[in-house]
Amino acid sequence: MSMFGTATRDNATRVLLLGSGELGKEVAIECQRLGLEVIACDRYADAPAMQVAHRSHVFDMLDADALQQVIDLEKPHFVVPEIEAIATSKLVELEAQGLNVVPTANATRLTMNREGIRRLAAEELGLPTSAYQFADSYESFAAAVETIGLPCVCKPVMSSSGKGQSVIRTPEQIEAAWQYAQQGGRSGAGRVIVEGFVDFDYEITLLTVRAVDGVHFCAPIGHRQEDGDYRESWQPQVMSENAIKAAEYVAEQVVNALGGYGLFGVELFVKGDKVIFNEVSPRPHDTGMVTLISQELSEFALHVRAFTGLPIGQIVQYGPSASAAILGQGQSQNIQFNGLDDALSIPHTQVRLFGKPDIAGRRRLGVALSRGKTTQEATDRAIECAKAVKIHY
C-alpha cells in the first residue's frame, strides 16, 4: 500500500526530476496533485518544471559527482529521469545502495543510447527490427553503409529530437551524414548507428504502463515527424486487429525486460499486420502529449500513478484527438505570445504554453490540443490552432 507524506514537511514524499522540460512540467503537476514534494533539476535555470516545483537545482546531469551531491542533499524517495543525458552509471551505483530510480536505473542506462536498447530488443529478445550496424570511425561508418545498403538512416547513438539524424540516399551524402551525426550527438562526437531504411505504412507510439496491477496499453498514437522531431500526433491510430496484437506483444516484451514501474513510450513501425521495433523511452513521450486531451488519465498521470505503486485500472480514451507542436524560430530571452483568442475560438481546442525562458534557433514552445469526430478533423483543428498562436521575439 502506498503511503505519502505531506509536501514541505519532514515526512514529505520527495520526487527528484532529472530534466525539467515540458514533459517534466506535466509530471511535476501530477505529483503536486498527490501532495508529493517536487525537486526539479536541469542544466539551465527557470526550466518549465522548475516553475511548478517546490525547489530546483541547476547543474550538468552528466556530471556524476554533481548528481551525487544533489541526491545526497535531497534524499529523494523517487528519482524520475525526464531526459537521456544523465550520468546513468551513477544511478546504477546508487540504485544498488537503495535509491529508487524510475522505472529502474538499468532501463535508464540501456535507453540513454540506441545501442543498448537495440541490442536488447534484437539480440536478447529476438524482436523484429531494421538491419543495423554500429560505427565509431568514418572508415567503419562507410563500411557499415556499404553493408546495410542505400537508402539507410544514420543517427548518433545518443541524441534526441532528431539531432544528428539523416537519410543517406546516394554515395555523395555519406561523408556529410557522418559529419552531421558527429555534430548532433548529445555528448559530442562519437558512435553512430546505421539502420536499413524501413518501408512502413505508418509509425506509432504505443504508450505502455507497467504497474502494480499489470501491463496496460493506451490506444495507439500516430504521428508525423519532420527533421526527426514530432510535429503532430493523433489518437487512436487505425490499425488492424493483428497489428495491434503484434504491437502489444512487442511492447510488453520490451517493458518487462526493462522492468520497474512507470510509463514507457514504445516506438514502432507498422507495415500491414507486421510490426517492427524502433525505440523506447522509459518515460512519457512527446507524441503522447495528445493524451492531455484524449484520455481520462494523461500519460503523465499514468506515469506518476505507476511509479508511486498505485493501480492503473482501466485506461479510458475519449475518442479522436490530436496535438500539434507550437514551434518557435528566433532569438529571444523575452518571448511573447498572442493570437490565443483566435486559437481558442476553434471548437474543442486547448493550448499549453511551456514557459521556456528563451530561444536560440528552433524550439518547441507549446502544443495545441484538439478533439473531433475523426482523427483527421482533430488533427486539422490542432494544426489550425497551433498556427493561430503568434510568437514575438
Curated annotation (Swiss-Prot):
Keywords: ATP-binding, Ligase, Magnesium, Metal-binding, Nucleotide-binding, Purine biosynthesis. It is an enzyme of class 6 (ligase). Mg(2+) binds at residues 267, 279. It comes from the Bacteria. Its EC number is 6.3.1.21. Gene3D superfamilies: 3.40.50.20, ATP-grasp fold, A domain, ATP-grasp fold, B domain. This is Formate-dependent phosphoribosylglycinamide formyltransferase. It comes from Vibrio cholerae serotype O1 (strain M66-2). The lineage of its organism: Bacteria, Pseudomonadati, Pseudomonadota, Gammaproteobacteria, Vibrionales.
